[in-house]
């Protein structure tokens, strides 16, 4: 296969096999980058439910960026119709991500009606950089988001931005992990790298 054919397979897999949920976001399936988002926080009896109905803000924000780049590549390759479809999908994904702004940050994931949203009352870092990079955050959102990331994620750890905020009233419970450890609020270089990229886009 050519590189373009391989990219098209991946693109179509996301749209046609993984699909989108009721909020227009990429479905969570077995999880996204953070396995603990499902396996660490969903009761064992409801994991199958969350996998079926869940939606990933992280994957959706990345798709908003990736589909736009892919669409531009298709146009440059002379595939006008396919390029237009990819660009339209990017715009739809961007709008779906933007709709989950809660006034302070973007939510993390939808786990189905029975379980609700993850990341509404606590700030999860993972989707935030990609919401900026993918264009879902407008200028006002960017400034609010940057301030909250600094105050709630950067200032609590000298080694970088933590994955999850915490306060006296609420902390996330992740099976088998202490607060501030690994996916349960630890510092991950990969996500901090995307954060640097995103923050560089803010005036």
Which residues fall in each region the model found?
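A generic structural motif
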Residues: 52-56, 69-70, 77, 202
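A structural signal for alpha-helical segments
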Residues: 2, 51, 58, 77-88, ...
């Amino acid at each position: 296969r050519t590189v373009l054919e391989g990219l098209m397979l991946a693109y179509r897999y996301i749209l046609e096999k993984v699909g989108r949920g009721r909020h227009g976001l990429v479905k969570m399936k077995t999880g996204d980058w953070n396995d603990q988002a499902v396996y660490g926080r969903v009761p064992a009896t409801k994991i199958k439910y969350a996998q079926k109905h869940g939606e990933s803000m992280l994957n959706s924000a990345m798709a908003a960026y990736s589909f736009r780049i892919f669409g531009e590549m298709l146009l440059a390759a002379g595939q006008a119709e396919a390029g237009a479809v990819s660009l339209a999908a990017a715009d739809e994904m961007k709008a779906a991500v933007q709709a989950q702004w809660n006034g302070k940050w973007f939510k993390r994931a939808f786990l189905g009606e029975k379980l609700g949203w993850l990341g509404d009352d606590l700030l999860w870092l993972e989707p935030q950089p990609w919401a900026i990079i993918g264009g879902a955050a407008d200028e006002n959102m960017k400034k609010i988001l940057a301030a909250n990331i600094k105050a709630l994620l950067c200032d609590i750890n000298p080694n970088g931005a933590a994955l999850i905020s915490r306060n006296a009233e609420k902390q996330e419970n992740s099976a088998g992990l202490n607060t501030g450890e690994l996916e349960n609020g630890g510092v991950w270089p990969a996500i901090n790298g995307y954060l640097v990229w995103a923050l560089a886009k803010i005036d």
